[in-house]
């Protein structure tokens, strides 16, 4: 498939496949974005994907689709955007099954994402939504939505195993520190300024560990916060639980995630490297070219490899294997 805008892509240029995926932009759905909704701006790419599926026709339409976005998709415009997207998939013949995965169950990064699998009727063997059970992958807000739309939306809610409780790796285990004095480390003036941007509780966390015999690590983002005097100030907010915050695209200076190392009488600060971001996305050892910003844009828009692997192993592979067992002519292609 060529690199055309999905809104103008011809369905005739799309090969016949068994699985079509769409991780469309979250810009207009995220609580951190413009919240214009799925019919506006970049997030309207969903409708380009829908158009292509529609134009492929019943004979060529993939039997399985997978869409992905931020969890704000569920609540965007009071749930209307999520409802409209699922009904649009229903109109193409797909019965739908939404669930949420957090990358922190697989890698040391907090990154919740909404996934929706759509299957054509001959593959639909799940629940109709009336009996959906609350779980980590289908928390209360999602199950409430499913139940409240059980008579309107065609569901096929598949029973799935529980994901891991937590990642085997910690933030510390993926860090690749350059030597002291390397240009990646911030100079003393910049570190002092950063320290003075912290809340007192985060300064206390630093101070307690400054003279530890081993290094301790945290991540940080800068966020503008209201102050007691009514003004607003850029604050450096630490995350100290051994998990990185959600990687973002570097559209502003505050979107770049900061790594903090404290111990052995030192406080050292730098940005996360491209290789460290790769590890946080489950792409250890991925060969990268280009600038740090280009890598951050790529990973900020990406889906955690381990989350997708979990879906493939526990959902897509069994689904397509079952289809083969009943004689459906399906080959594993994407």
Regions found by a protein language model. Give the residues of each.
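S-adenosyl-L-methionine
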Residues: 1-11
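Charged/polar, solvent-exposed surface patches and flexible loops
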Residues: 4, 51, 87, 279-282
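Active-site glycine-centered loops adjacent to acidic/histidine catalytic or metal-binding residues
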Residues: 5, 101, 300
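Class I S-adenosyl-L-methionine
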Residues: 9-19, 27-239
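Short, hydrophobic/glycine-enriched beta-strand segments
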Residues: 19-21, 246
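C-terminal target-recognition/interaction regions appended to catalytic cores
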Residues: 181-334
């Amino acid at each position: 498939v060529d690199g055309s805008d999905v809104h103008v892509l011809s369905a005739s240029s799309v090969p016949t496949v068994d699985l079509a995926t769409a991780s469309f932009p979250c810009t207009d759905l995220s609580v951190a974005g413009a919240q214009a909704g799925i019919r506006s701006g970049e997030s309207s790419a969903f409708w380009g994907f829908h158009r292509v599926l529609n134009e492929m026709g019943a004979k060529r339409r993939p039997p399985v689709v997978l869409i992905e976005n931020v969890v704000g998709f569920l609540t965007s415009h009071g749930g209307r955007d999520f409802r409209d997207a699922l009904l649009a998939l229903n109109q193409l013949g797909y019965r739908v099954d939404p669930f949420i995965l957090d990358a922190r169950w697989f890698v040391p990064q907090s990154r919740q994402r909404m996934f929706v699998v759509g299957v054509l009727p001959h593959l639909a063997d799940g629940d109709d939504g009336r009996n959906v059970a609350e779980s980590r992958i289908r928390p209360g807000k999602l199950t409430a939505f499913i139940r409240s739309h059980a008579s309107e939306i065609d569901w096929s809610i598949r029973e799935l195993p529980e994901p891991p409780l937590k990642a085997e790796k910690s933030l510390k285990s993926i860090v690749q520190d350059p030597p002291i004095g390397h240009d990646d480390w911030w100079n003393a003036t910049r570190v002092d300024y950063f320290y003075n941007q912290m809340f007192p509780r985060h300064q206390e966390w630093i101070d307690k560990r400054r003279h530890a015999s081993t290094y301790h690590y945290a991540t940080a983002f800068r966020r503008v916060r209201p102050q007691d005097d009514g003004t607003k100030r850029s604050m450096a907010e630490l995350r100290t639980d051994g998990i990185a915050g959600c990687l973002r695209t570097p559209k502003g200076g505050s979107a770049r995630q900061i790594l903090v190392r404290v111990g052995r009488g030192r406080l050292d600060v730098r940005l996360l490297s491209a290789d460290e971001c790769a590890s946080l996305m489950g792409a250890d050892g991925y060969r990268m070219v280009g600038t740090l910003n280009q890598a951050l844009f790529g990973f900020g828009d990406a889906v955690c490899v381990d989350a997708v692997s979990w879906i493939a192993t526990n959902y897509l592979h069994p689904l397509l294997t079952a289809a083969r067992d009943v004689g459906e002519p399906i080959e594993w292609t994407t």
